[in-house]
A protein has these predicted regions:
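Cyclophilin-like peptidyl-prolyl cis-trans isomerases
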Residues: 1-186
Length: 186
């Protein structure tokens, strides 16, 4: 029988890990409010995570952030007016944590600053996510787990979408996630 990966403490003491054998055990409390502060090479943004409507996705993101999974990872795909995609430690768009998890019903419309999971089809979520940065992203069909909203630092999302990119939408100057810190409140 497979065991889930144990859920780490949120105090920054968890080891740095980027590969796992199993998806994480459920370790968040959906009655609490979770916030992610994502510090990037362009500045910091604060993201309210939606543990009520996307508990499995928030659990996964918090688990990975607690393991410093996203530290030093780039946004590898940026399309102005659409979205900024990151969360792949290989920086290629093909990497992930070593497991996949199921989709959750999208209960709210995407808006600029929405945080959602990137996927390769139904139930293929892992570590990659995107931030909606423009009208093309707002119009996406509800097939990407929507699990957060930027509540401070939308100007960072806007600056990110405006970086110069190559023909494959890869930023010519890397946009790096320095760290993701999780806060919990009642």
């Amino acid at each position: 029988m497979s065991m889930a990966s144990p859920f780490p403490a949120l105090d920054g003491s968890a080891p740095v890990l980027q590969q796992f054998d199993q998806a994480p055990e459920f370790g968040i409390d959906t009655s609490k409010r979770y916030t992610a502060t994502m510090d990037t090479s362009l500045g910091a943004m604060v993201i309210a995570l939606d543990a009520v409507n996307a508990p499995g996705t928030v659990n996964n993101f918090v688990f990975l952030a607690a393991h410093h999974y996203y530290d030093g990872v780039v946004f590898h795909r940026i399309i102005n007016g659409f979205m900024c995609q990151g969360g792949d430690p290989t920086g290629t768009g093909r990497g992930g944590p070593g497991y996949r998890f199921n989709d959750e019903p999208v209960k709210q419309k995407y808006q600029i600053g929405s945080l959602a999971m990137a996927n390769a089809g139904p139930n293929t979520n892992g570590s990659q996510f995107f931030l909606i940065s423009g009208p093309s992203g707002v119009g996406l069909p509800p097939q990407y787990n929507h699990f957060g909203q930027v509540v401070k630092g939308l100007e960072i999302v806007d600056a990110m979408q405006r970086v110069d990119t190559d023909h494959s939408d890869r930023p010519r100057t890397p946009v790096v996630i320095n760290s993701v810190t999780i806060s919990v409140a009642d």
